[in-house]
Regions:
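Phosphate/diphosphate ligand-binding glycine-rich loop within oxidoreductases
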Residues: 51-124
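N-terminal glycine-/charge-rich "phosphate-binding" loop or analogous flexible N-terminal tail
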Residues: 1-50
Length: 124
């Protein structure tokens, strides 16, 4: 959907299993660019023209990457994870990039995943 009034968001490390849910959540609210590659020094420029970037826990949000994002106009960094140790928060603050994350995971989802892993181990 191309609408100049919608915030443009680049979503890095997009997995097939989450794209359906992201599309539902963003529908009519944001102009989304899905990028299957992780955020790195080499891929940061793919976010050019986007005001926000969404990343996963394995993406690189170090100071050099954040500097590139800032230079191309990124103002928001949204984490699709509770952990944020891969983000240079001091640099983000210095560059005036707002950072948001998932506050916590559902304890039910964690328990279900644990049981699924145990069943997979038993099967093998």
């Amino acid at each position: 959907m191309e609408n100049s009034s919608l915030m443009k968001v680049a979503v890095y490390s997009t997995h097939k299993f989450e794209k359906e849910y992201l599309e539902k959540a963003f529908s009519g609210k944001h102009d989304v660019k899905y990028i299957s590659s992780p955020l790195t020094l080499e891929t940061a420029s793919l976010a050019d023209g986007n005001e926000a970037v969404s990343i996963f826990v394995s993406d690189n949000a170090s100071a050099p990457v954040l500097q590139i994002l800032s230079k191309i106009g990124v103002k928001f960094l949204v984490l699709r994870s509770a952990g944020y140790n891969h983000v240079d928060l001091a640099e983000a603050k210095k560059l005036n990039i707002k950072v948001a994350r998932v506050p916590e995971y559902s304890p039910y989802a964690v328990a279900e995943h644990t049981v699924a892993l145990m069943l997979a181990l038993i099967e093998n």
